[in-house]
Structure formats: structure tokens, C-alpha cells
């Protein structure tokens, strides 16, 4: 006799893994069904996590008790903090990961969660009675009953892959599509659309001439995504490489347009604007003589490289001929060609802010089936769907993040209220309150909420309280401690900053743009001693304190705007009651 579950999650990608983990950790008996248990949270496209705004999302998932950041740190091969030259609202962590280790670590996580069962199979039908989902049926003829179901099917629903005029059914190279669900949902009034994404060829690193490429190393000091302290610092010892296309490459690519599924009308789905194929780029930006390409390593124990910026669905011979004209790739061999994939999605205006559907009760959607693109966006939706499915079962208030609380709140609000007409990707520009939604304070914004939900254990909540206490002590010291001209002027002159003529509070010095706490501590012994007393994460705590000191005026002003808007929304809401 098969058990009945509280929550069934369909699909083991980034959304599905976070959804299943959240539901089970909140105490719900949960089943995760996936077609291939060796590919949990598979990095189907580039082997990287984070990036502009996306890195903030990963840190928010971590702050709420999800696992994407922890798994990223364990599989990391390179770390970079993007946009360091800009203000802290724009800083975004990004990591290259070992694709195989990433999947393996996710499986370890899932197998250690007590109330989570795993099942390898393909869901072909939802069990729906009187407008409420009651479970699922699988290809093996198994029926699982549940109180709630979360669909996280990614690109697999009626997936079709293209290389030139050749087309193959599938949701990913070598994997079958999921069929039957869209047809069933259409009968219940759901609108179904088609979207397109793509991936580039994978290169054999043994055939790349790296001497002709520009090396791009990770940050000297490294870094991590999770707010937890790890036993070992994440690795940061693999480089990426940069090269460029040129007009001859573009000419070769153009010879394949007559065979391109994009230009022959075979593919009707809309592709991601911010991750266009190489054929899209040379048409849209015909005035550009070159396009930048990044060669990203797939892992520690492989020669495979991902060529970021060269996504294509052109015929294989055209792809290969064009690749061989790129500097450094004259003798390149490939492991497989690039391809486009077209798949079903459901316009997310058919959902509530909890990610529960409006047409079928207790059914939730998360990830690319909502019209988003990216591992990070998918993971965030999965986490929120997992949380809200459990709260629905308990008949407790829904968990909805506001736009001034998290990028996750911006993401879901955009999807539900605006919908999508192309694959949705998060950017810092989408957030009105990005000074509040920084990557450094995701734990301060969200970890207490995760603790209340039961996702963040007490020891982790204690870490947050320690961080806030040490940060506030550091800020108070800087506000009250005075420095004399003889003590600090040698440092100021070296830093190109105006010397003091009389004693000043340390705060006045730290506020100068050319001065940082880490630099000045070497010249102010009591400050250095205070920082050295901070156990473990002192770099993170110093950064948090410095951001608050330097940007306090901007932060306070933005918080006032957010609070004012909330009051207006409350008044409007009451007026409509």
C-alpha cells in the first residue's frame, strides 16, 4: 500500500529540489518525483550560479533556509563579486560550479531530509476531483495521492529540441519530454503558451589554444554564497577565458540561416531577450564587428568547456565551421552541438501570489513553466511554492514577500501582476528598492522569517543574532572613537585623502569614499583589536557595517519611500473592502 502524502513535487530541477526540501523540512510528508535521480538540479545550460540580481536571489534562498547557496559553495570552482566598482546595491556574487558535484551534493541534501521520499518515474496525469488536485498518475501506472501538488517540470512539457531542420522530442539532450499534462490543464481553462531557449556547443578543452585567450580568474580573496560558516573555504582555483567572434565568423553563421529553425518559422516560441542565440546577435546587432564569448570550465575532473555567448540551433556543420574561425578554437572539437528547445509554459497571471493556481485548488506551479529563465529564479519559486503548500494544508496565513523585502518578492509580484511575454530574468533594475535588497543583508532581511517557518534551525538563527550584535558594536565604536592627526594623517596622505588638523571621530574618516574599514584598521589599533575579536565571519560583518555607515542616508530615504507606499496600499485596500 503506497502512502498518501501532504505534498507531491513533480520534477527534480532547481525549483523542484527547493520545493521538496522546504515542504519536508516544515514537517510535511513529501514525495519528489523525477525522471532521473542522477540529475537533481541539473545545470542544463551554463555551469554557474548567481550573477547580477541572481546572486542576491541565491543569498535570499539561503537566508530563508533553502539549499542552493550551500550546494553552490560545495561545488564552487571560481568566485567573483560582480559590479564591485559600483555601489553595494549592485554587488552580485557569481560562481562557476562543477556541474557533476553540484548535482551530487543536491542528492546528498535530499536523501538526508527525514520526511522526504524520492521516486523515479514520469508523471503523465494529475488526479483532479471537484476542482481540487488529489494526486498524480505515472508512466509506470502508479497512483500517488496527496493534499497538494507542485508542478516544476521545467522545459520538459511537450519539449522539442532543434539543430537546424533536425528536431527531436525531449526536455534536455538525451531525455524524453513530459506529455499529457498540458492537454489536461487546457481542459480546466488554463492558457498554455510556447517559449524557446537554447544552449551552445560543449568544447573539448584539449583542443583549445588557451595562449590566444584572455584569462579571467576569480577574485583574489574568493568568497561564498551561504551565510553559514563552512569547514573549508569554497574553492576558487579555475579560470574562465575570453575570446571574440569577428566578421568572418558572422559570415559563416549567416550561411546557415536558411536552415535555422528560428528563421524558417519552425520555432514559434519566444526566446530570452537577455540571452540571445549567436544568430540573433549578429542580426540584431549587425553593426557590431565582434561579440564577446566566455569559455567556462564544466568542472575539476573534465576537459569540457561551455562557450557562453554562442548559443545556437544552426546546423552542426555551420556551428563547427564558425567555431573553428574563432581565435583559440582553430582546432577545436566538440562533445555535442548547440541546440534550441521549445516547450510549454503557463502564463503566470493564472496564479495567486502563493503560486497556487486560480483554476485548480492545491495545485502550485514553480520554475520555467511560469515563463521564467534561470536556475536562481526557479529555485526561489520552488522554495515559495513549497512553503505555501504546507501553510495551505495547515490552514495558516500565506507567506508572501513584499517588493521591499526581497528580490524573490519582486520576482513573484512581477510574474503574477504583469505576466510575461518572453522568458523572465531578474535584474537589479526591476527592483524599486534595490538599496534595501542588497546581497550582504539577505540574512538580516529574511532569516528570522525562515526561523518562524521552521526552515532555519536555532543555531543558524543564533548566528544571525551574533552578526547583528558584532556589527552594531563595530558601528558604535566607529561613531564614538576619536583619532588624532599624528595617529591617522600618515594613512590619509597615503590614501590621497585630506589630512586632519584636529581630533575627529573615526566615523568622519570612514565616511570618506577613498577610506575603508579594512584599510584604516591597520592604523587604529583598538579598531583592529575589536575586529579580530569577532569569531569567524569578520570580513562579512565588517562589510555589513561599512555599507550601513557609508550609505545610511540612502538606505533611510528608500525605507521611508517603501513605508509610505505600504501605508497608501493599506488605505487603498481598506477603501475597496
How should each PLM-predicted stretch be described?
Residues 2-15:
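Beta1/beta-strand and adjacent pyrophosphate-binding region of the FAD-binding site
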Residues 3-5, 139-148:
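Core beta-strand elements of the Rossmann-like FAD/NAD(P) dinucleotide-binding domain
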Residues 10, 143-154:
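Short hydrophobic core segments
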Residues 21-125, 140, 152-172, 176, ...:
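Conserved N-terminal/central alpha/beta ligand/cofactor-binding core
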Residues 127-143:
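Conserved beta-strand-loop-beta-strand element in the redox core of flavoprotein oxidoreductases
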Residues 306-372, 400-413, 538-574:
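A glycine-rich dinucleotide-binding beta-alpha-beta segment and adjacent secondary-structure elements
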Residues 378-399:
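Internal hydrophobic alpha-helix adjacent to the cofactor/substrate pocket in enzyme cavities
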Residues 430, 436, 447-452, 456-574:
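Extended, charge-enriched "interface" segments that sit outside catalytic cores
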Amino acid at each position: 500500500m503506497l502512502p498518501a502524502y501532504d505534498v507531491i513535487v513533480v520534477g527534480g530541477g532547481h525549483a523542484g529540489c527547493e520545493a521538496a526540501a522546504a515542504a519536508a523540512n516544515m514537517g510535511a510528508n513529501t514525495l519528489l518525483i523525477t525522471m532521473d535521480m542522477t540529475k537533481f538540479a541539473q545545470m542544463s545550460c551554463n555551469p554557474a550560479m548567481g550573477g547580477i540580481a541572481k546572486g542576491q536571489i541565491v543569498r535570499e534562498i539561503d537566508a530563508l533556509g533553502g539549499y542552493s547557496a550551500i550546494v553552490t559553495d560545495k561545488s564552487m570552482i571560481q568566485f567573483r563579486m560582480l559590479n564591485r566598482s559600483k555601489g553595494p546595491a549592485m554587488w552580485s556574487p557569481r560562481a562557476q560550479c562543477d556541474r557533476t558535484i553540484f548535482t551530487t551534493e543536491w542528492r546528498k541534501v535530499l536523501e538526508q531530509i527525514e520526511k522526504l521520499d524520492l521516486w523515479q518515474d514520469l508523471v503523465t496525469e494529475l488526479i483532479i476531483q471537484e476542482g481540487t488536485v488529489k494526486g498524480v498518475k505515472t508512466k509506470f501506472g502508479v497512483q500517488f495521492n496527496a493534499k497538494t501538488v507542485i508542478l516544476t517540470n521545467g522545459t520538459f512539457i511537450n519539449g522539442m529540441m532543434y539543430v537546424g531542420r533536425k528536431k527531436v522530442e525531449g526536455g534536455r539532450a538525451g531525455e524524453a519530454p513530459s506529455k499529457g499534462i498540458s492537454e489536461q490543464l487546457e481542459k480546466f481553462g488554463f492558457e498554455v503558451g510556447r517559449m524557446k531557449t537554447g544552449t551552445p556547443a560543449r568544447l573539448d578543452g584539449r583542443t583549445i589554444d588557451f595562449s590566444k585567450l584572455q584569462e579571467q580568474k576569480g577574485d583574489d580573496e574568493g568568497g561564498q554564497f551561504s551565510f553559514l560558516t563552512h569547514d573549508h573555504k569554497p574553492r576558487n582555483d579555475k579560470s574562465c577565458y575570453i575570446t571574440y567572434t569577428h566578421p568572418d565568423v558572422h559570415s559563416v553563421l549567416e550561411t546557415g540561416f536558411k536552415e535555422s529553425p528560428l528563421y524558417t518559422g519552425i520555432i514559434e516560441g519566444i526566446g530570452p531577450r537577455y540571452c540571445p542565440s549567436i544568430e540573433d546577435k549578429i542580426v540584431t546587432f549587425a553593426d557590431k564587428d565582434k561579440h564577446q564569448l566566455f569559455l567556462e570550465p564544466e568542472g575539476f575532473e573534465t576537459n569540457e568547456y561551455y562557450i557562453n555567448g554562442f548559443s545556437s540551433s544552426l546546423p552542426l556543420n555551420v556551428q563547427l565551421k564558425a567555431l573553428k574561425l574563432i581565435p583559440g578554437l582553430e582546432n577545436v572539437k566538440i562533445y555535442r552541438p548547440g541546440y534550441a528547445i521549445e516547450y510549454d509554459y503557463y502564463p503566470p497571471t493564472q496564479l495567486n501570489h502563493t503560486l497556487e493556481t486560480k483554476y485548480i485548488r492545491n495545485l502550485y506551479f514553480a520554475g520555467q513553466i511560469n515563463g521564467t529563465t534561470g536556475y536562481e529564479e526557479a529555485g526561489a519559486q520552488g522554495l515559495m511554492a513549497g512553503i505555501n503548500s504546507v501553510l495551505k494544508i495547515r490552514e495558516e496565513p500565506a507567506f508572501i514577500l513584499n517588493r521591499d523585502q526581497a528580490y524573490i518578492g519582486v520576482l513573484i509580484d512581477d510574474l503574477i501582476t504583469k505576466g510575461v511575454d518572453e522568458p523572465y530574468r531578474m535584474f537589479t533594475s526591476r527592483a524599486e528598492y534595490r538599496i534595501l535588497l542588497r546581497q550582504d543583508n539577505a540574512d538580516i532581511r529574511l532569516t528570522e522569517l525562515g526561523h518562524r517557518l521552521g526552515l532555519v534551525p536555532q543555531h543558524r538563527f543564533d548566528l544571525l543574532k551574533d552578526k547583528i550584535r558584532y556589527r552594531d558594536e563595530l558601528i558604535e565604536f566607529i561613531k564614538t572613537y576619536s583619532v588624532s592627526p599624528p595617529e591617522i594623517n600618515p594613512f590619509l596622505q597615503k590614501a590621497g585623502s585630506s589630512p586632519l588638523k584636529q581630533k575627529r571621530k573615526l566615523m568622519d574618516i570612514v565616511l570618506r569614499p577613498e577610506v575603508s574599514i579594512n584599510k584604516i584598521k591597520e592604523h587604529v589599533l583598538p579598531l583592529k583589536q575589536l575586529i579580530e575579536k569577532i569569531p569567524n565571519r569578520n570580513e562579512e560583518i565588517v562589510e555589513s557595517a561599512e555599507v550601513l555607515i557609508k550609505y545610511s542616508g540612502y538606505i533611510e530615504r528608500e525605507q521611508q519611500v517603501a513605508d509610505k507606499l505600504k501605508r497608501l496600499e493599506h488605505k487603498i485596500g481598506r477603501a475597496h473592502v
